[in-house]
Curated annotation (Swiss-Prot):
<feature type="modified residue" description="Phosphoserine">
    <location>
        <position position="2"/>
    </location>
</feature>
<feature type="modified residue" description="Phosphothreonine">
    <location>
        <position position="52"/>
    </location>
</feature>
<feature type="modified residue" description="Phosphoserine">
    <location>
        <position position="5"/>
    </location>
</feature>
<feature type="modified residue" description="N-acetylserine">
    <location>
        <position position="2"/>
    </location>
</feature>
<keyword id="KW-0391">Immunity</keyword>
<dbReference type="Pfam" id="PF03247">
    <property type="entry name" value="Prothymosin"/>
</dbReference>
<comment type="similarity">
    <text>Belongs to the pro/parathymosin family.</text>
</comment>
<dbReference type="GO" id="GO:0002376">
    <property type="term" value="P:immune system process"/>
</dbReference>
<feature type="modified residue" description="N6-acetyllysine">
    <location>
        <position position="15"/>
    </location>
</feature>
<feature type="compositionally biased region" description="Basic and acidic residues">
    <location>
        <begin position="13"/>
        <end position="37"/>
    </location>
</feature>
<comment type="function">
    <text>Parathymosin may mediate immune function by blocking the effect of prothymosin alpha which confers resistance to certain opportunistic infections.</text>
</comment>
<feature type="compositionally biased region" description="Acidic residues">
    <location>
        <begin position="38"/>
        <end position="74"/>
    </location>
</feature>
<keyword id="KW-0597">Phosphoprotein</keyword>
<protein>
    <recommendedName>
        <fullName>Parathymosin</fullName>
    </recommendedName>
</protein>
<keyword id="KW-0007">Acetylation</keyword>
<dbReference type="InterPro" id="IPR004931">
    <property type="entry name" value="Pro/parathymosin"/>
</dbReference>
<feature type="region of interest" description="Disordered">
    <location>
        <begin position="1"/>
        <end position="101"/>
    </location>
</feature>
Amino acid sequence: MSEKSVEAAAELSAKDLKEKKDKVEEKAGRKERKKEVVEEEENGAEEEEEETAEDGEDDDEGDEEDEEEEEEDEGPVRKRTAEEEDEADPKRQKTENGASA
């Protein structure tokens, strides 16, 4: 009878080890992805700084273009119709009493 309990314990521990290994691998994968995202953000910021430094003379012209784009975006604000609201956010559905679900 002791042989069966030893085998069961060995199987159980192997199963536990496999589950633990899977969890560790998942956690390591998440950390790696997070690290990559942080590196990408840092690299993106460095690239923007380099571009700004290289474009020294063109900097004034770019500002004027940016201001023109901003002015176009700031046009008169109008209220959306109910149809446009539904199209803009199709995930929202209204319940019978009118509240969002």
